[in-house]
Amino acid sequence: MAELLNVKPTRMELLNLKRRIKLAKKGHKLLKDKQDALIMEFFTIYDEALSLREELGRKMEEAFKALQMAEIDVGMLRLKEISLSVEPNKEVDIKKRNVMGVSVPLIEAESFRRSTSERGYAFVSSSPRVDLAAEKFEEVLDLAVRLAEVEETLKRLAREIEVTKRRVNALEYIIIPRMEATVKFIKQRLDEMERENFFRLKRVKALIEARS
């Protein structure tokens, strides 16, 4: 049996508890609906994360192969010089957006992909293979930024799902059962008190009749 609440067994408390149970059940339904919606959203984004991870893995493999070919073409020393001469890319701006009531990151950044002239190294000291390697790594950066946003969103959704689940379970298995058990107890106690009053009045009536 669920633990009873520490309240007086009165009709006022009975009415109050019935109202609280009604509100608790309404809150439980809303939280359960929220939990279900969060889980659906989580798995939708999870599928996107899996796809991005697979694509990122492929792109990184392509990028490192292209880098090896560029190194063969111009040599490691020259490749390092070229990398140091590259102009810094655009800044990444991290904002927030709302997903099912959860604040998640929104990474705003223009594509990292640039033309050869925008990268800042000299044409004469480079080669098509260096350009290809740079292009491949720029593709990797684009995917990595998107994946970072998606994975952080997943983490925050997972935390919110866990918090919501605890609230749902608390209402379902502790709070509502305690209130319902207390309502049952108060009803029984009021019935007992009513019977006691009835028999008390009956005895009083019998005594009065016996004296008259």
From Swiss-Prot:
Q: What is this protein called?
A: A-type ATP synthase subunit D
Q: Which PANTHER family match?
A: V-TYPE ATP SYNTHASE SUBUNIT D
Q: Which GO terms describe its molecular function?
A: ATP binding; proton-transporting ATP synthase activity, rotational mechanism; proton-transporting ATPase activity, rotational mechanism
- What HAMAP family does the record point to? ATP_synth_D_arch (MF_00271)
Q: Which Gene Ontology BP annotations are present?
A: proton motive force-driven plasma membrane ATP synthesis
- What are the subcellular locations of this protein? Cell membrane
The family note in this entry says: Belongs to the V-ATPase D subunit family.
What domain of life does the native source organism fall in? Archaea
The function of this protein is:
Component of the A-type ATP synthase that produces ATP from ADP in the presence of a proton gradient across the membrane.
Keywords attached to this Swiss-Prot or TrEMBL record, sorted alphabetically, are: ATP synthesis, Cell membrane, Hydrogen ion transport, Ion transport, Membrane, Transport
Q: Which organism is it from?
A: Thermococcus onnurineus (strain NA1)
One GO cellular-component annotation of the UniProt record comes to: plasma membrane
What gene is this protein a product of? atpD
Membrane topology classification: Peripheral membrane protein
On assembly, the entry states: Has multiple subunits with at least A(3), B(3), C, D, E, F, H, I and proteolipid K(x).
